[in-house]
């Protein structure tokens, strides 16, 4: 099968740096790998937290970074001013929509509810066929272990089909994670069965 075209990846991650230095180190690893592979980073456009670490690393390594930020956050003076391109949109919904349009794949790094909300939306869009792009979890320091167990529980309880659980890419190594994103083959689109 053909490997997916991977010119850009959207990263969803925290506007905080987290409790462990490992999160920052993982973000640096990912940034270096993206730049090395000439994959453009699409992200939330802020100059704070793990998201800034990924962006700064890609830029330092000679890569391209496109930030997408809503006016509300730009006005709070947290927009990153050194990016290849900064796109300012009106709402959070427009931000997600633009990131989904620009990206050939999606990676979640450690973050909070906003990170999960963004990731779950693209994961769901894959299930219903609105997009067919890799969705990956960069499991730095086993941060997402409980969430991954919950995905397994969803599958066991038949609220998540096996093909979608299997399509979810999870790895704690940046290079291995991107290898899997680049060789991603989309699962069949979800069909619905009526209850008996």
Name each model feature, range by range.
Residues 69, 103, 110-111, 126:
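Generic secondary-structure microfeatures
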Residues 41-43, 104-114:
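A short, small-residue-rich loop immediately preceding and capping a beta-strand
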Residues 2-102, 119, 140-175, 179, ...:
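A cross-family phosphate/adenosyl-ligand binding-site feature
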Residues 59, 126-133, 159-160:
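Arginine/glycine-rich "motif VI" loop of SF2 helicases in the C-terminal RecA-like domain
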Residues 110, 129-139:
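Short, proline-centered helix/strand-breaking motifs
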């Amino acid at each position: 099968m053909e490997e997916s075209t991977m010119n850009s990846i959207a990263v969803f991650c925290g506007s905080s740096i987290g409790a462990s230095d490992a999160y920052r180190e993982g973000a640096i690893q990912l940034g270096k790998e993206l730049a090395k592979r000439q994959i453009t980073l699409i992200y939330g456009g802020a100059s704070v937290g793990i998201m800034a670490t990924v962006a700064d690393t890609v830029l330092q390594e000679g890569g391209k970074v496109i930030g997408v930020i809503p006016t509300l956050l730009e006005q709070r003076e947290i927009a990153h001013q050194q990016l290849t391109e900064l796109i300012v949109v009106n709402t959070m919904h427009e931000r997600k929509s633009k990131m989904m349009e620009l990206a050939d794949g999606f990676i979640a790094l450690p973050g909070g509810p906003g990170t999960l909300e963004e990731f779950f939306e693209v994961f769901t869009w894959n299930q219903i066929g609105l997009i067919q792009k890799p969705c990956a979890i960069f499991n730095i320091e086993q941060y997402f272990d409980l969430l991954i167990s919950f995905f397994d529980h969803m599958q066991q309880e038949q609220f998540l089909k096996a093909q979608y659980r299997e399509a979810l890419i999870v790895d704690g190594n940046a290079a291995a994670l991107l290898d899997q994103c680049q060789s991603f083959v989309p699962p069949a689109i979800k069909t619905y069965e009526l209850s008996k």
